[in-house]
């Protein structure tokens, strides 16, 4: 089965390209184009009253669709922002900066978190414990040891590590070791929409952060976070959306917050991407496209891709260079580690000249897979690497 008919607008712009970087910027399906225009039309109709439509109709619909996708029992606990950093920093701003802050994380987190935490470490009262991702085979054991060695105020870990594609131990397997007073944030950006994910058993205990840019296929500008129900946390970094329902009432000296996920909301943003995300999720629902089906399709593509790699017998790009050769516990991109960053850059440029788009970081070359690929597409690698 091919899904290419759903991505014609993007594919027609790149007829001679094999786009192997959907893990960076995923092609948008055709349904998102009408959604983009729908936001414009709603703005024209509603003008200043469009917020009533967005908060009263559009946003609740997307909350319900996300709750279905992630098996979350409380749709109202999803909050939206333009980027994950904004949501992450709202959680961090709940901690008193005058008090010590102890953070547990890995050394494989994306820049939104890793850069911010390095900056926080410049404070004398912030301590960060980083568990090395490698060797990946023992990460789960070492992570659990770190959890048991001391208590933390904040724990942050990816669902899938961005620089390898390796699936991290699911939070449900180690949450029992975490005290109730510790806040837990899971970065689901490389898991949401790619790996079957159920938040049902952890929804009231963790923050789950993800966005539409990658496997949710709706582009930049719409990130979201599930917030534990009943949390009393009060983000210092807050905006007028965080108590939207009470804006017309007299403002009190004491800052009030919504009693659902919106307590972590910010302020005015462009909701065009929310419309696109709704279109994608509605398309999946109507066509019966589940994340499990997407994952199975991509796993088969990865096997087909590796079969071509084996045929090539390339001196650098081969199965031995795979960072981890385990498709069962892997995200939707494969990572090859070469001897040097210079060789990676040169190989990426050669592939690009041959019509194969990849991306790379240092010594690691990444190939991503998507619904708009067919197994036959990977034959292009032979020409690109000849």
Please describe what each predicted stretch is.
Residues 1-386:
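Pyridoxal 5′-phosphate
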């Amino acid at each position: 089965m091919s899904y290419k008919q759903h991505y014609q607008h993007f594919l027609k712009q790149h007829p001679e390209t094999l786009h192997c970087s959907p893990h960076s910027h995923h092609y948008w399906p055709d349904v998102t184009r009408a959604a983009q225009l729908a936001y414009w039309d709603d703005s024209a109709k509603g003008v200043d009253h469009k917020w009533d439509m967005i908060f009263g109709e559009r946003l609740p619909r997307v909350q319900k669709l996300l709750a279905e996708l992630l098996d979350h029992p409380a749709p109202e606990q999803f909050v939206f922002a333009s980027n994950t950093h904004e949501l992450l920093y709202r959680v961090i701003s709940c901690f008193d900066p005058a008090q010590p802050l102890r953070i547990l994380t890995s050394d494989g987190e994306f820049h939104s978190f890793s850069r911010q935490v390095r900056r926080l470490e410049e404070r004398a009262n912030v301590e960060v414990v980083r568990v090395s991702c490698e060797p990946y085979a023992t990460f789960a054991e070492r992570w659990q040891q770190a959890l048991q060695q001391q208590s933390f105020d904040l724990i942050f870990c990816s669902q899938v590590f961005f620089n390898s594609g390796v699936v991290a131990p699911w939070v449900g397997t180690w949450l029992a070791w975490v005290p109730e007073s510790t806040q837990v944030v899971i970065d689901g950006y490389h898991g949401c929409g790619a790996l079957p994910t159920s938040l049902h058993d952890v929804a009231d205990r963790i923050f789950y952060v993800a966005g539409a840019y990658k496997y949710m296929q709706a582009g930049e500008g719409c990130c979201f976070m599930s917030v534990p129900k009943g949390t009393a946390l009060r983000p210092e970094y807050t905006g007028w959306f965080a108590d939207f329902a009470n804006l017309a009432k007299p403002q009190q000296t004491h800052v009030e917050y919504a009693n659902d996920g919106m307590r972590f909301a910010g302020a005015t943003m462009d909701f065009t991407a929310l419309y696109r995300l709704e279109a994608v999720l509605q398309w999946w629902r109507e066509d019966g496209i589940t994340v499990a089906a997407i994952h199975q399709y991509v796993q088969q593509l990865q096997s087909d891709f590796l079969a071509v790699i084996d045929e090539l017998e390339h001196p650098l790009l081969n199965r031995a260079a795979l960072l981890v050769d385990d498709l069962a516990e892997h995200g939707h991109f494969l990572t090859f580690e070469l001897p040097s960053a210079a060789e990676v850059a040169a190989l990426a440029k050669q592939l690009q000249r041959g019509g194969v788009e990849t991306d790379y970081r240092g010594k690691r070359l990444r190939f991503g897979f998507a619904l708009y690929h067919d197994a036959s597409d990977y034959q292009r690698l032979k020409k690109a690497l000849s």
